Amino acid sequence: VKLWVVAALMLAGCSPSAAPGDESATLEQAAIARGVVRNPAATTPIGLYAREGDRLCIAGDRIGMFVDYGDDIGCSGRGTFTRDGEALRIDLGNGCAFEAAFDGDHIRLPGALPATCKRLCTRRASLAGFEVNRLSESGSEAAALRDPKGRQLCG
């Protein structure tokens, strides 16, 4: 009997197990199917996004963003983007190009950006780690966004 138990345990140890990434992918697919979360593949990024004093607009192939910490400390940039699945390839000009994550309702910039992006900021401000949530899917609202100095970012 002991030999049978040992053989059964060894055989069970050889059976394939689900990889951790598989489980999270399955959970995400189930949430999308039930409408709990938005399907990023079926969602256009066009619209207006915000979080505290940060704003981002997407209208057509144009993208603009700003952060405003007050006391003339902030960042402001505008440029173009292309979409590649759940990634937005953003080009704000003069070598400031990077990839941001898009999940259908949120846009998140990487924690490290090219040094050339620093020109978009004053004093110690940075766009690194910039993260915003969707407020509107309206292209016209996005096109109307202006930075704190009155510059139109997506129009």
Q: Where do the model's predicted regions map?
A:
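Sec-dependent bacterial lipoprotein signal peptides
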Residues: V1-A12
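Bacterial signal peptide processing site
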Residues: C14-S17
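Low-complexity, Pro/Thr/Ser/Glu-rich flexible segments characteristic
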Residues: P20-R38
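A composition-driven surface/loop motif
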Residues: E23-S24, E28-Q29, T44-A50, G64, ...
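N-terminal helix-cap/turn-to-beta initiation motif at the start of protein domains
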Residues: I32-A50, C57-A59, P148-L153
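N-terminal glycine/threonine-rich, aromatic-flanked beta-hairpin/loop signature
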Residues: R51-R89, L153
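C-terminal partner/receptor-binding element of secreted or periplasmic proteins
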Residues: T116-G155
